[in-house]
Amino acid sequence: MKEPDAIKLFIGQIPRNLDEKDLKPIFEQFGKIYELTVIKDKFTGMHKGCAFLTYCARESALKAQSALHEQKTLPGMNRPIQVKPADSESRGEDRKLFVGMLGKQQTDEDVRRMFETFGNIDECTVLRGPDGTSKGCAFVKFQTHTEAQAAINALHGSRTLPGASSSLVVKFADTEKERGLRRMQQVANQLGMFSPIALQFGAYSAYTQAVSDQLMQQQAALVAAQSAYLNPMATMAAVQMQQMATINPNGIIATPITQINSITSSSGTSTPPTLTATPVSAIPATLGVNGYSAVPTQSTVQPSSEAIYTNGLHPYPAQSPVAQLDPLQQAYAGMQHYTAAYPAAYGLVSPAFTQPPAILTQQPPQQQQQREGPEGCNIFIYHLPQEFTDSEILQMFLPFGNVISAKVFVDRATNQSKCFGFVSFDNPGSAQAAIQSMNGFQIGMKRLKVQLKRPKDANRPY
């Protein structure tokens, strides 16, 4: 029987030819083993050279760590074995809980009675506003981590209290480090610093990495399904465009894409739409990419609708910009829109620039306040996990195009997610790609519902 305070150990630097039965004699000399699992790649089944080990007694784990960690090198290995508490044990000293979705009428004493069956409580405080009104949440601090964990296991999501809009939330309170990271993310979002590199340092980076891995798998399947419309010449053109973007970005002229002309089945059995294009003679030589005509000319005075050459892919009509952009800004914008013109081909190679630098996307003050994209570019996402924030939803949808804004709706009283959000792209192509790939996408026990936002007024200008 495992003790309540038993420690889960991470074992590293073990030979890949050793499985559980081979490792057991090494570790059982320190005590009875509750669980020993070699870590394998979930897709290939290959041994990853490490394992998780849990003893029945906490004392056994401490003895094994003291005797083995960097003290012994197993046959065939260059470095000594690693024996240390797993990352999941790093919160072992946490005793303070955040309790959300309380009824407004519940007092400190009511909350204490709810939790006292799980152990001795040091602190219990319902959060209140300046006028003394409950905010619908509280902090509860137990004497031990085990008691706090037992309360989470028993109460989280178990009931909906009178006056609450959702089921009870019970989780460990954020550490000071996590609160600092959350504040940094909020500041970054307000400044428009939506860099996917910065998001890797978020409080939930491990969680979002798992989501990202699953997303990449689904996208790969989608690209394979759409490859019937992708001929070798289109692939070559996409690769050459990327090379040119890397070497000389200023040589590419931007063409903002505002709408998809048609969307057809990606099964490979339907007939690609007929393309109409401006005669080649009307396209200036400066727009050629190694002999491939990429984007037709545009007027900067009056909007016009012309077809972009897509070489066998679905056509993407383009509209000319209202105001003249500086060449460097045009260059960065142009690279993004080549991605839209050749989605499947471009996905096969690593993009040189994921998005233009913040300094290039500065807009007049009246445009900076605009948080929605043009009509047909805004999507709603339902059934999000409770712990998802703006950063997670942004990182999830960045692969589909340039995101103008990403927002998870939060209950003002409890500061808890309402489990739905809103994402705006700068072109309908990205929005439709996101809907096709992410609608029905499963995260844990949740299956996302992703759909296009319908404007309240179809004639509303953006």
From Swiss-Prot:
GO terms for biological process: mRNA splice site recognition; positive regulation of mRNA splicing, via spliceosome; regulation of alternative mRNA splicing, via spliceosome. The keyword Oxidoreductase does not apply. Its main location: nucleus. It is found in: Nucleus; Cytoplasm. It comes from the Eukaryota. GO terms for cellular component: cytoplasm; nucleus; ribonucleoprotein complex. GO terms for molecular function: mRNA binding. Keywords: Cytoplasm, mRNA processing, Nucleus, Repeat, RNA-binding. InterPro entries: CELF3/4/5/6_RRM1, Nucleotide-bd_a/b_plait_sf, RBD_domain_sf, RRM_dom. Residues 7-88, 95-175, 377-455 form the RRM domain. Pfam families: RRM_1 (PF00076). RNA-binding protein that may be involved in the regulation of pre-mRNA alternative splicing. Belongs to the CELF/BRUNOL family. This is CUGBP Elav-like family member 3-B. It comes from Xenopus laevis. The gene is tnrc4-b.
